[in-house]
């Protein structure tokens, strides 16, 4: 997967959402991936923010539009608009706060209620640098991810550990499902998506499982 590109020239535009409790590090994951920055004093997001980054996947240029919102209940009203058009999600918990992991199930249900059932989801245990404060063993995250057929990674936005890999894996899975469906539909493999359009990943329950997903 290639690095940063300045040009606003792409073949695919994928919307990816960050979900999970407030304070788990969603905004820092976003800024680390899109700007390679980390802010120790970042405050809770108010409303919705999004940032973009363009990468190459299998020779195609993919633009990721990544949305971040606060986890507090008072922002629930924006739910529908936030999820609309999303084809990927990072479901984030804090490995040092057990309650954030216990709330993952509620977040996943909400995600499924507002998106296509075949959305690509990565379960992310963030703040892996704080090993001395660990409250959620890696095996707990892996087990839940396997149970729900999700990808899984532990990350550290502070140390930039696995952040690139987590986003890249989600975008790669979305792209491969999308391109597979294009081939099956008899479309030209070089067909590009007009700017401003989202690729919808629909009706392909088995595709992600066939392709395989990360579990490290």
From Swiss-Prot:
Motif (Effector region): 42-50
Annotated Gene3D superfamilies: P-loop containing nucleotide triphosphate hydrolases (3.40.50.300)
Matches recorded under SMART domains: RAB (SM00175), RAN (SM00176), RAS (SM00173), RHO (SM00174)
InterPro entries per the UniProt record, alphabetical: P-loop_NTPase, Rab_GTPases_membrane_traffic, Small_GTP-bd, Small_GTPase
Main location per the UniProt record: membrane
One Gene Ontology cellular component: nucleus
Lipid-conjugated positions (S-geranylgeranyl cysteine): 213-214
Record-listed GTP binding positions: 20-27, 68-72, 126-129, 156-157
CDD domains the UniProt entry points to: Rab11_like
Topology relative to the membrane: Lipid-anchor
UniProt-recorded Gene Ontology molecular function terms: GTP binding; GTPase activity
GO BP: hyperosmotic salinity response; intracellular protein transport; regulation of vesicle-mediated transport
Intracellular or extracellular location(s): Cell membrane
Alphabetical keyword list: Cell membrane, GTP-binding, Lipoprotein, Membrane, Nucleotide-binding, Prenylation, Protein transport, Transport
Pfam family for this entry, one: Ras
Family that this chain belongs to: Belongs to the small GTPase superfamily. Rab family.
Function as written in the Swiss-Prot or TrEMBL entry: Intracellular vesicle trafficking and protein transport.
The protein's name: Ras-related protein RABA1b
Species for this entry: Arabidopsis thaliana
Native organism taxonomy: Eukaryota, Viridiplantae, Streptophyta, Embryophyta, Tracheophyta
This protein's encoding gene: RABA1B
């Amino acid at each position: 997967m290639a690095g940063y590109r300045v040009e606003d020239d792409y073949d695919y535009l994928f919307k990816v959402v960050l979900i999970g409790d407030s304070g788990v590090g969603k905004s820092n994951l976003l800024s680390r991936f899109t700007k390679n920055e980390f802010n120790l004093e970042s405050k809770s997001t108010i409303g919705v923010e999004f940032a973009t980054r363009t990468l190459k996947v299998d020779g195609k240029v993919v633009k990721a539009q990544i949305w971040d919102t606060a986890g507090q209940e008072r922002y629930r009203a924006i739910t529908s608009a936030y999820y609309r058009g999303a084809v990927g999600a990072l479901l984030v918990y804090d490995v040092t706060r057990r309650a954030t992991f216990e709330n993952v199930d509620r977040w996943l249900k909400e995600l499924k209620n507002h998106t296509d059932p075949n959305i690509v989801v990565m379960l992310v245990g963030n703040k892996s640098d704080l090993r001395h404060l660990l409250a959620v063993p890696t095996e707990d995250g892996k087990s839940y991810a396997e149970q729900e057929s999700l990808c899984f990674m532990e990350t550290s936005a502070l140390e930039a550990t696995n952040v690139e890999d987590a986003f890249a894996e989600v975008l790669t899975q979305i792209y491969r499902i999308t391109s597979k469906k294009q081939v099956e539909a008899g479309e030209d493999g070089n067909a590009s998506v007009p700017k401003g359009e989202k690729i919808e990943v629909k009706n392909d329950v088995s595709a992600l499982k066939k392709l395989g997903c990360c579990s490290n």
